[in-house]
Amino acid sequence: MTFTKSVDQTTILQGDRSKLKDLLRVRLNACGWNDQVRLLCRETIKDQDTVNCDALVQQVTPKARALIPDTVKKELLQKIKAILIQQEGIDI
């Protein structure tokens, strides 16, 4: 079993996954990331004649991920580590 699968299974079973998703949603909204991605989508659509949803997602996703502040990434990682340590006693 890979580490990622272990994290997924552990967080799903313990109900922490939704808490982590809520935290991420709040932090991204607070730093203006949602607005940045919305503008990025508008610019992408405006620059092309026809864009379907799948193509838009493919084009915007890498740029949107790069816009996530390091502080948000670090906070989420710390929360995940704390959950794993608390639940599994995993030494990371």
UniProtKB/Swiss-Prot annotation:
What is one cellular component GO term in this UniProt entry? transcription export complex 2
Q: Which Pfam families match?
A: EnY2 (PF10163)
Sorted UniProt keywords: Activator, Chromatin regulator, mRNA transport, Nucleus, Protein transport, Transcription, Transcription regulation, Translocation, Transport
> Could you give a GO molecular-function term held by this entry?
transcription coactivator activity
**In its UniProt record, which GO terms are filed under biological process?**
chromatin organization; mRNA export from nucleus; protein transport; transcription elongation by RNA polymerase II
Record localization: Nucleus, Nucleoplasm
What highest taxon heads this organism's lineage?
Answer: Eukaryota
The set of disulfide-linked cysteines is none
Q: How does this chain assemble? A: Component of the nuclear pore complex (NPC)-associated TREX-2 complex (transcription and export complex 2). Component of the SAGA transcription coactivator-HAT complex. Within the SAGA complex, participates in a subcomplex of SAGA called the DUB module (deubiquitination module).
Query: What family is reported?
Result: Belongs to the ENY2 family.
Role, per record = Involved in mRNA export coupled transcription activation by association with both the TREX-2 and the SAGA complexes. The transcription regulatory histone acetylation (HAT) complex SAGA is a multiprotein complex that activates transcription by remodeling chromatin and mediating histone acetylation and deubiquitination. Within the SAGA complex, participates in a subcomplex that specifically deubiquitinates histones. The SAGA complex is recruited to specific gene promoters by activators, where it is required for transcription.
Q: What is this protein called?
A: Enhancer of yellow 2 transcription factor
Query: Which organism does this record belong to?
Result: Culex quinquefasciatus
Gene behind the chain: e(y)2
